[in-house]
Amino acid sequence: MDKNVFSQLAAEFDRMERTITYQKEVISTMQKTPTCPCCKVPADGRIYTLPELPKMKLDDCSWAEIAMYAQSGMADKVFAQGDTKKFTLSDGTVMTARIIDFNHDTDKENNILPITFETVETLNDDFQMNPEYINKGGWQNSQLRKVLNNSVIEMLPADLRKVIKPCLKKTSLGGNSEKYGLTSDPLFVLSEQEIFGRKIYSHGGEGHWYGWYRQENTEYGKCKQNGEQDWRWERSPCSGNANYFCGVYSSGDANRNGANNSCGVSFGFCV
């Protein structure tokens, strides 16, 4: 038998075995509190809290399996917020995706996207938000948005690209404008409000606080793969300013920077 075929079969059998093991755990857990099938009340008439399902380890699952659980509506039951999965870019860089919330984002048809991920690290290279010192047009017209969704996305492994769903985002159009724009992309950069839960330097109204960042003692700062602390972009144009975008300083504090400066990029995506 061809070695590649053998390896593929072995991997498939391994996935099947893990799925069966998990299903056995679910059945065992649910059997601990038998309930009436119609009203969910136990035969003895007492009300019990349904047991929490055991969680699957994200890194043990393929992207196809993760997407399957997402589409089944069970993602928040079988995976844990904060769990991570590694993936390798086409240049050999290993990155880590973290679950930052469930059922938080939507697509342009207003369908709920079950899982939102964000990279734990920033990309190796730094990027300008725009080649010019302006924020006019906001994230919608930014160079970084084009780079992420034309170049960086092509560096993702094919199995990950296949399951990513375009996500709808509302963002200020910058340039001292009070207007907002809508974008729908596979990859995006988080807004100030999605990270800090409020407007600090931004216009506000750009999404809602992600569950991961809402937790106490969450680290807001990020590092590159070599451990170097990195200043990173947010997609939010700075309020009352035509030149700056918001960002997160290497210490984790809210900050801002000129649009033509080169800074780190941590991106989000939905499955």
Regions found by a protein language model. Give the residues of each.
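Collagenous Gly-X-Y triple-helix signature in extracellular proteins
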Residues: C36-V271
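Secretory-pathway extracellular proteins and peptide precursors enriched for disulfide-bonded cysteines
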Residues: S28-Q31, N257-A259
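Heptad-repeat coiled-coil/leucine-zipper oligomerization helices
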Residues: V5, E12-R15, T19-Y22, V26, ...
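A recurrent domain-boundary module in secreted/ectodomain proteins
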Residues: V26-I27, V271
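Exposed, low-complexity/repetitive linear segments and helix-based recognition motifs
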Residues: L9-D14, Y22, I115-E118, S250
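Short, intrinsically disordered, low-complexity terminal segments
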Residues: S7-Q8, K40
